Amino acid sequence: MPGVDPRPRPYHVATMTPDRQFRSPVRHFWRWLIPALLLWAFALQGTRGLWSPDEGRYVDVALEMLKSGDWLRPHVNDEFAHVTKPPLTYWAVASSVELFGRHEWAARLPHALAFALSVLLVGAMGRRLVPERPWLPALVYATFVLPYVAAHVITTDTLLAFFTTAYAAAFVEARARRDSRGAGGYVAAGWAAAFASAILPGTP
């Protein structure tokens, strides 16, 4: 037929790139999961009593600090020195109980805060290391079983994890700002967090 080109015409199939797939409603659902998990971490802190012997021992030492006013020499039962752990965990528990009262959730609150801050720090590292999906590392950490469970138990683990994450995040940020004047401050913050992770909370 005159005026009709018999040659086949190319056609294009519209496809979604991997990045656009992550922008679907499913992605937004997963992003809501992080604050939901953090809320869950705080909400369940007072649903059970203290576990013996570890949680009871940490709280006993913290209460002795409040009773005696001596925050430098941990004691148990007014007489037995308890120096097997550095004092930061005791200080955190004692401060929380002093502010909010003698409740199980108050004793565990510092660990829930440390977990929440660790999730935010992992997200900050994700912003630098995975800029196309900065929320993904935070989601992965928030859904790990052990960090989440540790946020509900009074031990040194969660505080130690927080300071370890803090110095990693500080050095990642310092690396990203290496050509700017603010890099030195992040390096100093990283070394301070490294010192705190090694000296203050102690190891399990």
Task: Give residue ranges: language-model regions.
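Membrane-integral, polyisoprenol-dependent glycosyltransferases
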Residues: 17-204
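Short, positively charged and aromatic/hydrophobic N-terminal segments
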Residues: 11-12
